[in-house]
Amino acid sequence: MTAIVDIIGREILDSRGNPTVEVDVVLEDGALGRAAVPSGASTGAHEAVELRDGDASRYLGKGVGMAVDAVNGEIFDAIGGYEAEDQAHIDAALLALDGTPNKGRLGANAILGVSLAVAKAAAESKGLPLYRYVGGVNARVLPVPMMNIINGGAHADNPIDFQEFMILPAGAPSFAEGLRWGAEIFHTLKKGLKDAGHNTNVGDEGGFAPNLASAEAALEFVLKAIEKAGFKPGEDVYLGLDCASTEFFKNGVYNYEGEGTVRDIEAQVAYLAELVAKYPIVTIEDGMAEDDWVGWKLLTDTVGSKCQLVGDDLFVTNVERLSRGIKDGVGNSILVKVNQIGSLTETLDAVEMAHKAGYRAVMSHRSGETEDATIADLAVATNCGQIKTGSLARSDRTAKYNQLLRIEQELGDSARYAGKAALKALA
């Protein structure tokens, strides 16, 4: 009864007004699964290929008509009739059909849309929520939200070179309370920025992009907001950074153009270690550039015992790159973005490999999102304990938080909030 009888791809708009792929998968019993594919602004060089048309007469070249055509034609022809519950078999067939190492022929956006829609259709057919269908009976851990409330780097037009400044309400007793804490801090920060004469418009991920001079200035503003909202930094709420260092790593050095500073590899590590010592920072994402394996090893040896070091551009949700990181003792956590690798099975494989090696996993959105809340279910399904899905503004971000609220309510007494145990520095 879970045989695939129809696959319908379409071009929709993401949160930045750019086209993306949405896919409906219809099963023999009438069950329907729908998935929309996200898109990143700062993308790693080793990510799977997001296929764009390149036709300047449509959407300034960013159309996804070729990917949609692949969904409606070649992909449906290949997997029509397959049983949707056989996810691994379907994903393997999609990879074989594409035939490239980076999904460059059909496009990761086409393959992922189908892969996720298949899982959602199968869950619907079984009468199960997606997190339970994918994760099984023990999927009940609600993740700590990593809320990006100040933006810099590629996500903002300000002098701050780091891309994201996040708060983590790890001391909260539940996900719902953690979300409330975050919202209260967000609004307190907004008032503080406004009172100081800063712009409070929000960026791609719902965070503020004030014209602050440095990372330290941003961290100080966030600390004050936490305290003014009535919470204790380093006890109730912790800080996190996404440096997105690949974006400013040029000619072997880290060139902070906004701040007017250049740091070599050793100086970059020393600077991050200094920030960890000075502030209650418990997680740093992409503290070193994606191919600076030497720098990553030095950073891990220096602060890895007291801070979560998350590889995003470094690992790109790819088991081959993660395997190298584990072998070399580089980083201690992986950021999981479904569209970096391009299928559900490969995403789950990356999380499983990380957990087996004692690495943490963080489920993540992209800066170009939709109302699709699949990653909320996947965060619970994988018991990863952390989710990164933006600030407390913009419905493309809050859609994921709201889905997690529903899941926590549905789980009732069996729900567990990951809290401090989710973070290597606090466990």
From Swiss-Prot:
Please list every transmembrane segment annotated in the UniProt record, as residue ranges: none
- Binding-site residues, (2R)-2-phosphoglycerate: 163, 337, 366-367, 388
The record's cofactor note says: Binds a second Mg(2+) ion via substrate during catalysis.
Tell where it localizes: Cytoplasm; Secreted; Cell surface
Q: What is its EC number?
A: 4.2.1.11
- UniProt xrefs under SUPFAM superfamilies: Enolase C-terminal domain-like (SSF51604), Enolase N-terminal domain-like (SSF54826)
Q: Name one GO biological process term.
A: glycolytic process
Instruction: Supply the name of the protein.
Output: Enolase
Q: Which organism is it from?
A: Xanthobacter autotrophicus (strain ATCC BAA-1158 / Py2)
- Name of the gene encoding the protein in the UniProt record: eno
